[in-house]
């Protein structure tokens, strides 16, 4: 109620009556009125026509004071005070720093000083990219009774909206779906279906991720145009078999333009990344060809507009392996350059991997090429009780003495693996909200990792 409205209502009220002008009204006895509906705030503040100026003013002031007190009590009642909410408020406060700090969060200094204690801005960004990876699981159709088993359940243009991810829907637009297959003679993923189902969307292809680009509004918040690539983890039987193909293969043999034949990666991962089926319209091109074409197109478009561009690749489990392999391939193939050629004065789009619970991908020479010569950054989020990051290369890995590893690689032993990037190790047993269990899959769960980050 404004002062002008209050003055108008008070001026219309009669002054205090005197003895000479007092009148008496005969009141008839009637039945008690029915209960009235609760009055709204606006109606409670209306002045009675028979009230006097002084009484009305006192009543109004008292009612306003009561309403203010009630509002303050309600604010105190709903004010969050737990540690998690405090961290979220701190992260929101630091969001304004992201345009100036995005290269640091993207690993320009290998996250020095940001992991212990965890930087609140890095924490929020890790959770955000982890949710982009989780979306691959939530959108995958793994129902064997579905005619579209192995595909994505939602259309590309409504991907995040249909998943109920409004923040991601406002922040990113999916530009391409990614599909993969394998040419090994393994039992078909759809082996439980009869031949009468030959008209299924695809007998051999599987939807395995997507490429998205930040919107104009999100790019302003991030401080650059971000190209996000999310890879799905292991769900189907076919991919489990690929996980178990435990021997190294030179990447140059698979068409990746690496000048060093000693750079090797796990064979099952690279097969899933490079295999294709010309008879299938979804896998006519390999996952590698699909992602490189899309990244080149987006980088060329936005660098031509004079924007800073970053490439952020994320994935969980098998998706982590594909994320590391594709990030390496993008840098090795110069897909992060506007003209696709390594020339003086041309700036590369920064490439970073946010990996969750991923296995080792390549040998020691792959790590050297990945980190040192190409400058790709990787932050690996792991659970110390999860066995997947320990494989492959349980005995011969980056943890053995350098001399032993060099001798093993010189003898061309096929089980010498090395992790890439920086590790952020978490422990689910330190969380009071997660119960300890004998199921090893719980330690590998992506949502558990995101909870531990939060």
Enumerate the language-model features and the residues they cover.
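Structured beta-strand/turn binding interfaces of compact recognition modules in eukaryotic regulators
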Residues: 124, 129-140, 147, 157, ...
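Beta-strand elements of modular eukaryotic interaction domains
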Residues: 198-203, 209, 216-220, 300-304, ...
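Short, surface-exposed "cap/lid" segments of acyl-processing enzymes
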Residues: 202-256
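Catalytic nucleophile loop
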Residues: 320
